[in-house]
């Protein structure tokens, strides 16, 4: 079937594009809204970071849970020039090589020259020596020039040095 484009109307107030099309057969007409979307491209950066983990006492009343608690203090280098502060909770499994942790940290500084802050959420497990780690930007946590930031981060440790890989979209 041959489609004939019969008109376009740009509605600036709502940033919607309305396209009216007519079909050659049946002369049926319909209006189709399409949102104008600014192209967003995934970006990738990597670099080093320094980290200080400081053990903390268990929260009062939950000592029997045998959870580890630490503060996080990081300094990121490279295209992410930032400082982060956060907290981590961890638990060891009953079998050697099994454990888990969760952490939240607020990262403040510049990302490829754009200033602001955002929050990273960590979820990590070690299942009998096999690690699995997810670190993602908390939705809508970006501030200032980092508003709308989304993404995921990976961490590698080589020769006692810490490295990050950050895949992100910034509108």
Q: Which residues does each PLM region occupy?
A:
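Targeting-peptide/extracellular-domain and disordered-appendage signature
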Residues: 4-5, 13-171
């Amino acid at each position: 079937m041959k489609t004939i484009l019969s008109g376009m109307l740009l509605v600036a107030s709502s940033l919607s594009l309305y396209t009216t099309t007519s079909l050659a057969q049946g002369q049926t007409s319909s209006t189709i809204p399409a949102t104008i979307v600014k192209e967003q491209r995934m970006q990738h950066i990597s670099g080093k970071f320094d980290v200080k983990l400081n053990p903390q006492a268990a929260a009062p009343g939950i000592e029997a849970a045998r959870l580890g608690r630490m503060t996080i203090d990081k300094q990121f280098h490279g295209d992410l020039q930032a400082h982060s502060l956060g907290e981590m909770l961890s638990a060891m499994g009953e079998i050697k090589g099994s454990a888990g942790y969760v952490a939240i940290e607020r990262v403040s500084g510049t990302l490829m020259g754009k200033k602001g802050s955002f929050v990273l959420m960590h979820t990590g497990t070690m299942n009998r020596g096999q690690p699995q780690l997810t670190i993602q930007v908390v939705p809508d946590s970006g501030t200032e020039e980092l508003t709308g930031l989304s993404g995921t981060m990976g961490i590698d440790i080589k020769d006692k040095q810490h490295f990050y890989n950050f895949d992100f979209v910034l509108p």
